[in-house]
Design a protein with these regions (language model features):
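Residues that flank catalytic or metal-binding motifs in active/ligand-binding sites
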Residues: 8-10, 78, 174
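Short loop/turn segments at secondary-structure transitions that flank enzyme active sites
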Residues: 16-20, 88, 184-186
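Short, small-residue alpha-helix embedded
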Residues: 55-69
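Long mid-to-C-terminal assembly/interaction modules of large eukaryotic proteins
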Residues: 173-328
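An often Trp-containing, charged/polar helix-loop segment at the C-terminal end
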Residues: 71-96
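Catalytic-core environment of secreted peptidases
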Residues: 1-56
């Protein structure tokens, strides 16, 4: 049922009441549902609702709050922030992640609960010990080279992490999380359902530099990985997938990808470069449709946080960014 190639659904969970069960079956129960206004105003002003309808309404309200606070934000970023702020409850982990293996327990958790319950406060604001950086970018994934069609662009972003601050934390636990969001153009016709390269116009992926890797080696590895999609050869080197909680097999589906690394602060000191690169889609494979030179927008969110409340990660990051971005 849960074919690993399909997008993650649901993506987030929100409160929508509860159902009553007799052990064999379940049914809606007004006492456990949410109160709302009625469409039949002549007979009753209020009624109850439960299930996906109120959950969708709450998700829409949260998205509206984000746009109210940041009116210039892209839709890709709104979706990314909601998922980036989400987390699983202890009960979700206890029930669904009975097996800690990425291929079974974590996949079951992800396919059942999505990325968890979003936090509007976390989506809206940074804290001293929890900092998120949002990058809105655009790239042209494909190009025509003579009579052939090839991969064209990847983006490399430098992350302004405070090395001295992280080094001073030593073995303190730090979580680095990455979320990449974009929108695809579905493949025309039913042919797209037969091949994963035919339904999406273009897919994107992210990769983080390894601790023992130079920037040049990182760029070469990602470049080979991007071009190697033609032959399914991902090139030399490793993406360090084992350090990610979900791993590439679980997260690299659909058009939004989110994952995190739990590590010591000192091990993340050198995690200062992240790449966004394309993989094959029908824009390139069905070149007779004339879409091979189109561009795709994306939103990339990268955050670091630590449970230590007396740590200030925010100030040195903002200071470093301010020295790079010119002011008018």
């Amino acid at each position: 049922m849960w074919d690993k190639k399909w997008p993650i659904k649901p993506e987030i969970l929100l409160n929508a009441g509860n159902a009553a069960s007799n052990g064999d079956d379940y049914s809606d129960c007004p006492d456990l549902s949410l109160l709302t206004t009625s469409s039949d105003l002549r007979n009753r002003l209020l009624t109850t609702t439960c299930g996906t309808s109120p959950a969708t309404a709450e998700a829409s309200w949260m998205a509206a709050q984000l746009l109210k606070e940041y009116p210039d934000m892209w839709p890709e970023t709104v979706r990314a922030l909601l998922i980036h702020s989400a987390s699983w409850t202890p009960k979700m982990l206890e029930r669904f992640k009975t097996d800690d293996k990425k291929s079974s327990g974590k996949r079951l958790l992800l396919r059942t609960c999505g990325y968890g319950i979003p936090s509007l406060e976390k989506a809206l604001w940074c804290k001293n010990n929890s900092v998120s950086m949002v990058i809105e970018g655009e790239l042209q994934p494909f190009k025509k080279d003579g009579s052939s069609y090839k991969m064209k662009e990847m983006d490399l972003h430098e992350l302004p992490w405070p090395s001295e601050c992280l080094m001073s934390l030593g073995e303190t636990s730090v979580r680095l999380r990455v979320t990449l969001s974009y929108f695809i153009e579905p493949g025309p016709g039913e042919i797209g359902w037969k091949d994963r390269y035919r339904y999406p116009s273009c897919n994107l992926r992210f990769d983080l530099i390894n601790n023992d890797e130079s920037v040049e080696d990182f760029k070469k590895r990602v470049n080979i990985k991007m071009r190697g999609d033609d032959t399914k050869d991902k090139g030399d080197g490793t993406s360090g997938s084992d350090r990610w909680y979900l791993g590439t097999d679980n997260r690299d589906v659909g058009s939004i990808h989110s994952d995190f690394i739990d590590s010591s602060a000192i091990e993340l000191c050198n995690a200062k470069h992240i790449a966004v690169y394309p993989v094959i889609g029908w824009w390139r494979e069905r070149h007779h449709l004339g879409k091979y030179n189109k561009k795709i927008r994306y939103s990339l969110i990268v955050s670091i946080e630590t449970p230590e409340t007396d740590v200030d990660l925010y100030t040195p990051i903002v200071t470093k960014i301010a020295t790079v971005i010119p002011t008018n």
